A protein has these predicted regions:
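N-terminal Lys/Arg-rich, disordered targeting/topogenic segments
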Residues: 1-14
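Helix-centric, low-specificity signal for extended rod-like, repetitive segments
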Residues: 6-9, 20, 98
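Hydrophobic single-pass membrane-insertion segments
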Residues: 31-43
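Residue-level detector of conserved, function-critical positions
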Residues: 40-67, 78-446
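Hydrophobic membrane-insertion alpha-helices, especially the h-region
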Residues: 16-34
Length: 446
């Protein structure tokens, strides 16, 4: 019986405690409502005073009262008050205050799409193109709006073009140490055309991981970016076609083999052609067919592909994807050789990380996405796959660059145009000048 009374007593005490807490919570709500109501009244008093000042066109004083109302009181009316303050700034021509408020709203994530557009246009007028691009980039991430997108696309592809005096050059790798020929020998230049390694080589590859292969007095030699020798060929190779990572492709008597970058044979297997790739896989040709091999030269696929599309880096793969051909046409594959989509195209260019340049049976070029869907119709004489959101296209005999909406972003008056690599591309102008085109806002495309 005593135990039963104890249990009942505990239950009663628990109920009392709960009732006390409920009453306290109710009182807290009442107090908060009273305080909030007081805040709303005080806030409204400031706004009424501001309206009186506006009748006399004393906008800056009205602005200050609105700011005080926003800063000192946090009520449900604050979002509306802030938008009304924008109207006051615009009506009173308080330009600096207007854009400061928009900037604050953008940072807080409360700005509307038109505010992003207005602020970006203001930044462009002030000559701050980079900040305008950043503003539009933030807006693009939040809104699907044609006006914002059109403005963003119109400014994000700002570029500089620098002439280099050498016309016989090779496409560099991502480091942009450019192999160039002075008419007699090969050397290396940077993007401004300055010589970084003298013209002393009979042949020269691009650099990969700070190494390149050059030919000196008939012997292939591994050099660093400082020009120092690190290895020499003892295989009497006839040609070195590529270097990538720790491997090179050497040719002897018309047969291709893979060597270490110190010219040690990695296999005694001969191929008809070989492409190395940054992702480590090897694409090799034997008996007229292509296969994908691992970095250990083990077959990932059989020799089943009729052709492979090579990109401007001289590689078949970009990341984990490539374009290959079978008897029905070109299509996309992943690094394990499995198809990415079912669509087959009459022709295709190597993948560069964006839209893929593909052709129809008539030889007209357009663009496919990664699902095999045509997103830019077949209409061009030639094209290169997209990189950095731009695709080089040939139209009416001249090259230019289009964006994903098929708008010409870099005028089509070029004799030739390469893919963008690390934000830069090599072009030839209609006057025959070789130039390096550099995107001003490369970080936007990363």
């Amino acid at each position: 019986m005593a135990k039963s009374k104890n249990v009942v007593g505990k239950a009663q005490r628990s109920i009392k405690l709960i009732l006390i807490l409920l009453v306290a919570f109710a009182w807290l709500i009442v107090v908060m409502m009273v305080l909030n109501n007081n805040d709303e009244k005080k806030q409204q008093k400031l706004l009424d005073s501001a309206q009186t000042l506006m009748e006399d066109k004393l906008y800056i004083r009205a602005y200050n009262l609105y700011q005080e109302a926003l800063t000192n009181y946090q009520t449900k009316e604050n979002p509306k008050i802030e938008k009304d303050l924008l109207d006051i700034c615009k009506e009173g021509n308080l330009k600096a205050e207007y854009y400061q408020l928009i900037e604050k709203r953008i940072e807080a994530g409360t700005a509307e799409v038109n505010e992003y557009v207005e602020y970006a246009n203001y930044q462009l007028e002030e000559g701050s193109a980079m900040t305008a691009v950043n503003t539009l980039s933030k807006g693009e991430a939040l809104f699907d709006d044609d006006t914002l997108t059109q403005l963003y696309e119109s400014v994000k592809y700002g570029y500089n073009a620098y002439e280099i005096k050498y016309s016989d050059i090779k496409t560099p790798s991502k480091d942009w140490i450019i192999p160039a020929n002075d008419g007699t020998k090969w050397g290396y230049i940077n993007t401004s055309g300055k010589v970084v390694l003298d013209f002393t080589y009979e042949e020269a590859t691009h650099f990969s991981n700070n190494y390149a292969v050059v030919k000196i007095d008939g012997v292939y030699t591994l050099i660093g970016t400082n020009g120092y020798w690190y290895a020499v060929d003892k295989n009497d190779l006839d040609e070195v076609t590529d270097i990538c990572g720790d491997k090179v492709v050497g040719v002897k008597d018309g047969k291709y083999r893979i060597y270490s970058y110190t010219f040690q044979p990695l296999s005694d297997v001969d191929f008809e052609n070989i492409y190395l790739n940054d992702n480590g896989v090897i694409v090799a040709k034997k008996d007229g067919k292509w296969a994908i091999l691992s970095d250990k030269l083990e077959n990932i696929t059989d020799y089943v592909f009729d052709d492979v599309a090579v990109n401007d880096l001289g590689q078949v793969f970009y990341g984990d994807y490539a374009m290959v051909k079978d008897q029905d046409g070109y299509y996309g594959i992943s690094r394990d050789g499995k198809p990415c989509f079912d669509t087959k195209f009459a022709d295709a260019k190597g993948y560069m990380g964006g839209l893929i340049a593909v052709a129809d049976q008539s030889g007209k070029w357009g663009y496919s996405n990664g699902h095999g869907e045509i997103v830019i119709d077949y209409q061009y004489e030639d094209a290169r796959s997209f990189s950095y959101d731009l695709g080089a296209v040939k139209y009416a005999g001249k090259w230019g660059y289009v964006n994903r909406y098929n708008s010409m972003m870099i005028e089509n008056d070029l004799q030739s145009a390469g893919s963008f690599i690390s934000g830069m591309s090599l072009v030839t102008t209609k006057a025959g000048e070789t130039k390096v085109v550099t995107l001003k806002y490369e970080s936007l495309f990363e």
